[in-house]
Swiss-Prot record:
Belongs to the metallo-dependent hydrolases superfamily. Adenine deaminase family. SUPFAM superfamilies: Composite domain of metallo-dependent hydrolases, Metallo-dependent hydrolases. Keywords: Hydrolase, Manganese. It comes from Cereibacter sphaeroides (strain ATCC 17029 / ATH 2.4.9) (Rhodobacter sphaeroides). NCBIfam families: ade (TIGR01178). Transmembrane segments: none annotated. GO terms for biological process: adenine catabolic process. This is Adenine deaminase. It comes from the Bacteria. It catalyses: adenine + H2O + H(+) = hypoxanthine + NH4(+). Its cofactor is Mn(2+).
Length: 565
């Protein structure tokens, strides 16, 4: 909905009525920190007039409201919302999120470039502005079996796509430091372009080396001290609050007006139930202000600083010439959007209904033979056994050990000690490999849960106490083309089909949200105490997050970057 330069000038000068005028509201000026009573004139997709009175062909009364720039989620995986980009758009844009920068590496790990192209094509049809970073680590390491592998030469044809913003989170930070040839080829190919980072707990000179590779932004800081070191060394820090990784409380002390130009907000992984119950970037804004962060710092991080960090110079302020991304709020503290404009378009049912669709990809992606209960045995001769220790609200895990005596050659789950079986089974039709181990922290007393959302290789992951229930849940996902399942006593208690790559539903986000409520209740009936058991399970298989993880190839000591014998 662009207009000619002449039209923009004339409407900005007030010589002719503007296409749209937001009347009588107060604009939160992110440069001066002032709240200013003014009309906002819009021509096509651009703001053309502020700090004055305007007439418009269409006028909306914003009396008693505060206007702020639309919010920017600077790092997320849309697939973690469990819906397609179209439903994600409908779910979060009305909350004020007008730009999102996504890394589609979940779908890319299942079907490669086809998945990235799907996101690029879909992004052209949304109400929000969805930008795509090219997935840097498919697979994330050599210690897993993904459905695809992407090298620098594979990404090169998409580098100059108008909706691409550089290279996505470079998770294989050990590969960067060890100058792995594949990592070096990607870093060289994107030299001078935006490269997003991923370096949990990396400090000192190793962090210097990682940043020197050209990496500019990073979202894995979990303490204020870690975040400050990254800021001091020139990184833009993206404060994260996802459904599992919740770092806002730990980092809110650095969210000051002094630091805000170098801080952004992101959600990384957030599902529709969490969005419905709490919110998205709007939830982060409310929470940060409630915890004492200055509103000016918070709103800068949510828009202006984010735009500048990722080179989106046309947005982030309510000012002439900027993209008309505007959230009309009840208050700065409440951050509830009464009206949202994305590129001058009101984000309402009519706008969402007017979008054209794109055929989804990666159907029938669960390629695994029927699984027998015996597949979940954990053989071993020694009693001393590595155990993944869950830290609620974190994707970092503990590397624990427990004495588990084998019985008939099998180390069995022990719910009395909160020791559940965990298994990962290759599901891309490549090796048929599987690995079993132990996890502590679910609180599970019976039954099993299974998922094909299993970062980042997205193999089939199962946690349980009873092998027969584990097999039942896993086999149910074969029939559903992937998803989530809860089983106990030989019955499926709850399920959610995710047929798009085993990652995303084809249903409206409201139905997915309701299914997650049922799944959560079913998991609790097994004794599970985690708020988000399926997302927590998904991250137990990611071998670039310390300290102990599991993939289809075995238990992974992330600190030593090797598979345990």
């Amino acid at each position: 909905m662009s207009r000619s330069l002449s039209e923009c000038i004339d409407q900005g000068r007030g010589l002719v009525p503007a296409d749209l005028v937001l009347k009588h509201g107060r604009v939160f000026d992110l440069v001066t920190g002032e709240l200013v009573q003014t009309d906002v004139a819009i021509c096509g997709d651009r703001i053309v007039g502020t700090f004055g009175t305007y007439a418009g062909r269409r006028e909306i009364d914003c009396r008693g409201r505060i206007l702020v720039p639309g919010f920017i989620d600077t790092h997320l995986h849309v697939e973690s919302s469990l819906v397609t980009p179209f439903e994600f758009d409908r779910c979060v844009t009305p909350r004020g999120i007008t730009t999102a920068i996504c890394d589609p590496h979940e779908i890319a790990n299942v079907c490669g470039l086809e998945g990235i192209r799907y996101f690029l094509e879909a992004s052209a049809h949304l109400v929000m502005d969805l930008r795509v970073q090219l997935s840097s680590c498919v697979p994330s390491t050599h210690m897993e079996t993904a459905g695809a592998a992407l090298e620098a030469k594979d990404l090169a044809p998409l580098m100059d796509h108008p909706r691409v913003i550089g290279l996505a989170e470079f998770m294989n930070f050990p590969g960067v430091l060890m100058k792995d040839p594949g990592c070096m080829a990607k870093l060289e190919a994107f030299r001078g372009r935006h490269i997003d980072g991923h370096a949990p707990l990396l400090r000192g000179k190793d962090l210097n080396g990682y940043i020197a590779a050209g990496i500019r932004t990073e979202h894995e800081a979990t303490t204020a001290d870690e975040a400050l070191e990254k800021l001091r060394k020139g990184m833009r820090v993206l404060i994260r609050e996802g459904s599992v990784s919740k770092d806002l409380h730990a980092l809110v002390s650095i969210l000051t007006e002094r630091h805000a130009p170098y801080l952004c907000l992101c959600t990384d992984d957030r599902n529709p139930l969490d969005i419905a119950e709490h919110g998205h970037i709007d939830h982060m804004i409310r929470t940060a202000i409630r915890l004492g962060a200055p509103p000016l710092a918070v709103y800068r991080a949510a828009s202006l600083s984010a735009a500048e960090a990722f080179g989106l110079k046309d947005r982030g302020l309510i000012a002439p010439g900027r993209r008309a991304d505007i959230a009309v709020l009840d208050s700065l503290e409440g951050c509830h959007a009464a009206l949202v404009l994305a590129g001058g378009v009101v984000a309402d049912d009519a706008a969402f209904s007017a979008r054209s669709d794109v055929e989804p990809v990666a159907r029938a992606s669960v390629k695994v033979a029927e699984i027998a209960p015996e597949a979940f045995r954990c053989p071993g001769n020694r009693a001393e056994t590595p155990v993944i220790g869950i830290l609620p609200g974190k994707i970092i895990t503990e590397h624990l050990t427990a004495e588990i005596e084998p019985v008939d050659g099998d180390k069995r789950p022990d719910p009395a000690r909160d020791l559940a079986r965990i298994a990962v089974i290759e599901r891309h039709g490549k090796t048929g490999g599987r690995a079993t181990g132990f996890v502590r922290g679910f609180g599970m007393a019976r039954g099993a849960i299974a998922s094909t959302v299993c970062h980042d290789h997205h193999n089939l992951a199962v946690v349980g106490i009873d092998y027969a229930d584990m097999a039942l849940a896993a086999n149910r996902l074969r029939a559903l083309e992937g998803g989530f399942a809860v089983a106990a006593g030989g019955e499926i208690l709850a399920e959610l089909a995710l047929p798009v790559g085993g990652l995303m539903s084809l249903r409206p986000f409201e139905e997915v949200r309701d299914a997650l409520v049922t799944l959560r209740e079913a998991a609790r009936s097994l004794g599970v105490t985690l708020e988000e058991p399926f997302l927590q399970l998904a991250f137990l298989a990611l071998p670039v997050i310390p300290h102990l993880k599991i993939t289809d190839r075995g238990m992974v000591d992330v600190d030593r970057f090797e598979i345990l014998p």
